């Protein structure tokens, strides 16, 4: 006889948290100093197979220390923003961490390279007005700290004209190497 008997029962598969994963590495970024950075970490950078598990984001330097003062990270929009200055030229390594609802994390690092751009020299210390008596020799050295340039390795060259851009009077010369004005004005130059 082919008699059978059966019973039914349920098997419940309990969900356990799966750690989020790195799906797509974050691309390195480059920016010129004094330029505004705005970079959004792509939404598909990290993945989590757990249904209804949302990720939250944080960013630090790769060693866990805070981002430099010029750089901020919006944890809601995943946007890095800021304007690096001359002092920030070079590369930093940034770590972005995604955390799921069960506090499991995954991280990725990427570099932000700040390229140097030429900065104009600036007037650091105004040149004091000078006076000389007619028929007396003038010798005045423009102080070395009169002008400044924040660009490392830049050296300044000097030239002198009248304030309207025209040439110096014939009695006055300027040595561009030593920054020395010299000459003897006559009565006609008063």
Q: How would you name each of these model-derived features?
A:
Residues 1-3, 98-104:
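Short, solvent-exposed loop/turn segments at the edges of extracellular beta-sandwich modules
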Residues 48, 74, 100, 149-151, ...:
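Acidic active-site catalytic centers that drive phospho-/nucleotidyl reactions
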Residues 64-85, 94-95, 165-186:
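Strand-loop-strand motifs at the edges of beta-sheets in extracellular beta-sandwich domains
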Residues 4-5, 9, 18-60, 87-91, ...:
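Extracellular ectodomain surface segments
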């Amino acid at each position: 006889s082919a008699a059978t008997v059966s019973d039914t029962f349920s098997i419940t598969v309990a969900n356990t948290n799966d750690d989020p994963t790195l799906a797509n590495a974050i691309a390195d970024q480059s920016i010129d100093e004094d330029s505004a950075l705005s970079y959004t970490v792509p939404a598909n950078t990290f993945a989590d197979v757990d249904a209804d598990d949302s990720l939250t984001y944080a960013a630090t330097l790769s060693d866990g220390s805070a981002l430099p003062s010029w750089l901020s990270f919006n944890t809601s929009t995943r946007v890095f923003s800021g304007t690096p200055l001359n002092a920030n030229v070079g590369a930093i390594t940034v770590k972005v961490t995604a955390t799921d609802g069960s506090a499991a994390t995954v991280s990725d690092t990427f570099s932000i390279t700040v390229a140097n751009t030429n900065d104009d020299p600036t007037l650091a210390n105004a040149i004091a007005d000078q006076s000389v008596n007619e028929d007396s020799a003038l010798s005045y050295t423009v102080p070395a700290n009169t002008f400044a340039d924040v660009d490392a390795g830049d050296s300044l060259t000097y030239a002198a004209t009248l304030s309207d851009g025209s040439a110096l009077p014939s009695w006055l010369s300027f040595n561009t190497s030593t920054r020395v004005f010299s000459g003897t004005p006559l009565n006609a130059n008063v």
